[in-house]
Every structure is written in structure tokens, then in C-alpha cells.
Amino acid sequence: FDVPVSGTHAHSWIMSFPDEYTAFKAYADIYPNACLLLVDTYDTLKSGVPNAIRVFQEMKEAGIPLTKYGIRLDSGDLAYLSKKARKMLDEAGFPDAIISASNDLDEFLIDSLKVQGAAITSWGVGTHLITSKDCPSFGGVYKLAAVMGKDGNFIPKIKLSENTEKVTNPGNKKIYRIYEKESGKIKADLICLADEVFDENEPMLLFDPLEPWKKTKLPAGSYTLRELMVPVFLNGECVYDSPSVMKIRDYSKKELETLWPETRRLVNPHKVYVDLSAKLYDIKISLLDQMSAE
């Protein structure tokens, strides 16, 4: 996937040597340009950090450039230990030494550590990143939205439910993302019928699909539109060129910048609205009225 790989050594590396210092020295000899030492195998502040400092001093005296070096904390009170370790490293003359932290970190722990003033410069996130721990499954079911009539036109269909959020949106549809023109931030996503065309120089009316009394009117010229859906398969043939992992990452980072700060906050975030066009809303209400009359 052309993704750069980096990391440190394991506790087993330390334990395979007679003592911690010898293990650190051997690792530094092998990786002098990427010397990140795991300091919590025995005692972080009494032996781990002092032994790491000893190795760094020896590298410095030997004329080895200290380009990328530091320590990793993998247990204990990371806020407290990082502050103590930072003080020890600074006093020893290594103010640019990296302090990396790991140990089942997620976005909430990282945010908490930052609030506590933890002296951590690098975050190692593994388990929570690769396992989708907070949401391990994606709930999705097939629902019919439209059938093609004999004349070639789609006939919209709707499914009702005791749960409002499970009532489907009828018809053959497409999706636009609406951006506020002034800020470039996302205003809402718009679900509309596949044949609808919009003019950014005309006002637009949006309907909340769950709370239809909530309407948003966008003034003409105040927004821009981008269609989100692209063809992947046409007539059984794949017509989509999958981008590289790095391009996907770049796209994701770019799109994240279009979210409002209130949407990106970890606690009680504001939501991105997904609305219906006036035409789709009218069809949905019409079908609901028909179903309730039967």
C-alpha cells in the first residue's frame, strides 16, 4: 500500500538481554537514526529513563547525530510520567527528545491527556484504530426504493415502520453535498431524485426527513453543490479506478477540514444534517398519505 512503517521495540527485546542498559545500547547500535526506547519494562523513572539518557549521552559523545530519538511510555499514569520524563530529559540536555505514548489509546484518552498537560509529542494508536472497537459492525439492510415501470420510468416505493427513522425515502435518488460559499464548510447533505437539477444562483429549500416541520432556506448564491455518488459498476462492469490508500487519506483529510469545529468536537458534537429536496419530500408525503388512507 506504499504506507511508511515505523515503530519501536517490544518489552521482549529488553527482557532478552542481561539488563535494560545493554538492551538499549544494542538497539541504538542497530537503529541510530530512529532510536526510540521503551522505558517501562522495569521502572520508568528509576531505570528506564536514566538508562535511555545514558545511551543518548554516549551516542552524542561518539558523534552520532541525534536526528530521531526519544522514549516510549506504555503503562502507568501517562500524564504524570511524561511530565517527569520530560524534566529529566531536558535537564540532561535532550530537549528535543521525543516522548511517545501508547497503551490502548483512543481519541478520548488522548484528549484527556492533552487537557492534563501531558508532555507527549507522539501518539501510538493501534488496537482502537485497526479494530473499530467502539463500532465493530455496520448495520445495513436492503430496502426497495423504486421499481421500473413498463414505460421505463421509476415508480417510487416506500416502507413504513413503527420507528420514524426506519421509514425509507422513496425513489431513484442521488446525493449532493452543500457547502457554505463564504466559509467552505458543510451546510448539509441533500438527498434528491436522480433527475433533479439545481442552480446555485437560485434559492433552495431543504426538508428534515425526520422532523419535516424543520425547513432550511438557502439564499441564492450563498452555497455550492458537489455530487457525491460516482459510478462503480455499470451493466455488470467495474468502471471505477480505485485510488491509492494515500490518495484516500489525503481526500479524507481535505474533507475533514470542511466540517465545522462544533461537529468535530468529541463531547456532544453537532450533527451534519442530511435533508431532502422539496420534490422528494413531496413524493414521500404523498406516499405516506396514500398508505395511511388504505
PLM region spans:
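Short hydrophobic "strand-cap" motifs at the C-terminus of beta-strands
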Residues: 102
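A broad "ordered helical/assembly scaffold" signature
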Residues: 83-85, 99, 273
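Buried, small/hydrophobic-residue-enriched core segments of structured protein domains
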Residues: 1-92, 105-115, 129, 150, ...
